[in-house]
Curated annotation (Swiss-Prot):
Organism: Staphylococcus aureus (strain Mu50 / ATCC 700699)
PANTHER family hit by this protein: GLYCEROL-3-PHOSPHATE REGULON REPRESSOR (PTHR30363:SF4), HTH-TYPE TRANSCRIPTIONAL REGULATOR SRLR-RELATED (PTHR30363)
Protein's job: Repressor of the lactose catabolism operon. Galactose-6-phosphate is the inducer.
Designated name of the protein: Lactose phosphotransferase system repressor
Key words of the record: DNA-binding, Lactose metabolism, Repressor, Transcription, Transcription regulation
Record-annotated HTH deoR-type domain positions: 3-58
Family annotation (InterPro entries): Carb_Metab_HTH_regulators, DeoR-like_C, DeoR_HTH, NagB/RpiA_transferase-like, Tscrpt_reg_HTH_DeoR_CS, WH-like_DNA-bd_sf, WH_DNA-bd_sf
One record GO biological process: lactose metabolic process
GO molecular function: DNA binding; DNA-binding transcription factor activity
DNA-binding region: 20-39
Length: 251
C-alpha cells in the first residue's frame, strides 16, 4: 500500500467511525505508529480530520465550528434552490407560516409567490426578502430579541415570549446536522427558540441538503419522527434512504 492509498484508507476509516484511535489504524493497516502520526498530521492539514488525544476525529462528522452566514451562501446553492422550490410547492394561500433561520429558508422566501399569506420569522435576512413582497393580504412579521450575528436570527427571552403566543399552520426550518434521527444546531438558545416554534406548528418541514446528513452538532432540538416531512435534494441516494427510515421525504 503506497502513501496515497494509505491516506485514502485512513480518511475512509475516520469518516466511517467518526473518531478513531491511533492504535486501531496501526493494527488495521499494519504500519508503524510513527507513520500513522505523520499521516494524521497531513490529513489534518488538508482539513479532513482533527487530531485528538490518542487518535483523530472526522471533520465531516462533527459540525464543531459553525461557519459564517456569508460562507453558507456559497455552499450547495443548486441543491438549496431545488429544495426551496420543492418547499414552496407545499405552501397554500391562507397559510400562517413560521420561517426559521438559514440560507435554504432564505431561498424559500425568494420562491414564495402567493397572494394571501401570513409569515412570521425570527431571521432578519428572511424578513428583508419577504418584506419586499408585503401587501394588504401578504403580511410579514419579524420576531425580535437578542440577535445571533452568525445566523442573524433573534433568540432569547423576548423572542420566546412572542413565540409562545403564536400558532402556525406550517413551519419551514433548517439545521446544521442530522444524525440517527436527531436534528441539531449549534447553540442552546437557538435550539429552544426552534423548539417553541415547532410545538406551536401543525405541519413541520425540515429543509436540508444531503451534506447535513450524518453530521453532528452541539445540541439536538427535535427528532425526525416528530416532523411532517423532510425536503432535501437527491444528490446522495443513500442519505435520502437513511432519512426515509425515520420520516417521509418530499418527492
Amino acid at each position: 500500500m503506497n502513501k496515497h492509498e494509505r491516506l485514502d484508507e485512513i480518511a475512509k476509516l475516520v469518516n466511517k467511525k467518526g473518531t478513531i484511535r491511533t492504535n486501531e489504524i496501526v493494527e488495521g493497516l499494519n504500519v508503524s505508529d510513527m507513520t500513522v502520526r505523520r499521516d494524521l498530521i497531513e490529513l489534518e492539514n488538508k482539513g479532513i480530520l482533527t487530531k485528538i488525544h490518542g487518535g483523530a476525529r472526522s471533520n465531516s462528522t462533527f459540525q464543531y465550528k459553525e461557519i459564517s452566514h456569508k460562507e453558507k451562501h456559497t455552499r450547495q446553492i443548486a441543491e438549496k434552490r431545488y429544495i426551496a422550490r420543492k418547499a414552496a410547492s407545499l405552501i397554500e394561500d391562507g397559510d400562517t407560516l413560521f420561517f426559521g433561520p438559514g440560507t435554504t429558508v432564505e431561498l424559500l422566501a425568494e420562491e414564495v409567490n402567493h397572494h394571501t399569506l401570513t409569515i412570521i420569522t425570527n431571521c432578519l435576512p428572511v424578513y428583508k426578502i419577504l418584506l419586499e413582497k408585503q401587501t394588504a393580504h401578504f403580511r410579514v412579521y419579524l420576531i425580535g430579541g437578542e440577535m445571533r450575528h452568525i445566523t442573524e436570527a433573534f433568540v432569547g427571552e423576548m423572542a420566546n415570549a412572542m413565540l409562545e403566543k403564536l400558532r402556525f399552520s406550517k413551519m419551514f426550518f433548517s439545521s446544521n446536522a442530522v444524525n440517527k434521527g436527531a436534528v441539531m444546531t449549534s447553540t442552546l438558545d437557538e435550539a429552544y427558540t426552534q423548539q417553541l416554534a415547532l410545538s406551536n406548528s401543525i405541519e413541520k418541514y425540515l429543509l436540508i441538503d444531503h451534506t447535513k446528513v450524518g453530521k453532528e452538532d452541539f445540541t439536538s432540538f427535535c427528532q425526525l419522527n416528530e416532523l411532517t416531512a423532510v425536503v432535501m435534494d437527491y444528490e446522495d441516494e443513500e442519505k435520502v434512504e437513511t432519512i426515509k427510515t425515520y420520516i417521509e421525504v418530499v418527492d
